[in-house]
Amino acid sequence: MQIFVKTLTGKTITLEVESSDTIDNVKQKIQDKEGIPPDQQRLIFAGKQLEDGRTLSDYNIQKESTLHLVLRLRGGMQIFVKTLTGKTITLEVESSDTIDNVKQKIQDKEGIPPDQQRLIFAGKQLEDGRTLSDYNIQKESTLHLVLRLRGGMQIFVKTLTGKTITLEVESSDTIDNVKQKIQDKEGIPPDQQRLIFAGKQLEDGRTLSDYNIQKESTLHLVLRLRGGMQIFVKTLTGKTITLEVESSDTIDNVKQKIQDKEGIPPDQQRLIFAGKQLEDGRTLSDYNIQKESTLHLVLRLRGGQ
């Protein structure tokens, strides 16, 4: 169904929703349209602030209802972040924000990945899981941003096509971290990556230093095709989508791949095989789905009007 969201500036946003959508989902859709982070949004309907975990139907929000969007300024404040170059960044934060949140805001403004940021206040390095109020950081406080170069180094990743990727890493980075960096650069999902060094396949939870990988070492990237296979997904329009999967992939993974290809959110997808609706947490092998099997994709309209 359609609902409307009215902002304090008078702008009205139209959203496609289902009555089973949670308030979190709605805030996500608003972020997608308007770029406003969910944690800055307060949604009001019939004079009541809506809670994230509840659904539209819980609040009896029906088609063409109008919600009001207010930006959260409760506890909101400005703080400053000073870099080693002398640049000062101004951030809108709340005292309940975690250090992770602050690093994310710095990334949004400056493009510096959180894992390269160290934040210092009153001579103390701030820990990710703690909040600004834990450190008694108040409005117009100044934090200092230091880039983490401890153990920082370049390594190379060579693909089977002969392409070489350069990565900025630290010896304390895990293999998971490295795969994430490769995804950021090349778009290859971590679960399709196998990394080889000195003839040995590297395990996700281990660090570069565990494997004695030093600056300017070269890793080899092999795409995981063990158990890999193609399956087909047929839509009601008759379109057939081809997916590269593994029998150990969960139905969630498959829905994610469909979203990547077709843009259909996983929560709108129902997948059918052999007359049975497939459950998210189960794997393809649980359902005996083999190479070149065909699944049927039905769009969830339950609650939609």
From Swiss-Prot:
UniProt-listed Gene3D superfamilies: Phosphatidylinositol 3-kinase Catalytic Subunit, Chain A, domain 1
CC annotations in GO: cytoplasm; nucleus
GO biological process: modification-dependent protein catabolic process; protein ubiquitination
Keywords carried by this UniProt record: Cytoplasm, Isopeptide bond, Nucleus, Repeat, Ubl conjugation
Locations listed in the record: Cytoplasm; Nucleus
Glycyl lysine isopeptide (Gly-Lys) (interchain with K-? in acceptor proteins) crosslink site(s): 76
Prosequence residues removed at maturation: 305
An example Gene Ontology molecular-function term: ubiquitin protein ligase binding
CDD domains: Ubl_ubiquitin
Signal peptide feature range: none
Domain Ubiquitin-like: residue ranges: 1-76, 77-152, 153-228, 229-304
Placement of covalent cross-link Glycyl lysine isopeptide (Lys-Gly) (interchain with G-Cter in ubiquitin): 6, 11, 27, 29, 33, 48, 63
Record-stated family: Belongs to the ubiquitin family.
Other information: Ubiquitin is encoded by 3 different genes. Crp-79 is synthesized as a polyprotein with one copy of ubiquitin fused to ribosomal protein eL40. Crp-6/ubi-3 is a polyprotein with one copy of ubiquitin fused to ribosomal protein eS31. Ubi is a polyprotein containing 4 exact head to tail repeats of ubiquitin. For the sake of clarity sequence features are annotated only for the first chain, and are not repeated for each of the following chains.
Role noted for this protein: Ubiquitin exists either covalently attached to another protein, or free (unanchored). When covalently bound, it is conjugated to target proteins via an isopeptide bond either as a monomer (monoubiquitin), a polymer linked via different Lys residues of the ubiquitin (polyubiquitin chains) or a linear polymer linked via the initiator Met of the ubiquitin (linear polyubiquitin chains).
Protein name stated in the entry: Polyubiquitin
Lineage, broadest ranks: Eukaryota, Fungi, Dikarya, Ascomycota, Pezizomycotina
Name of the gene this protein is made from: ubi
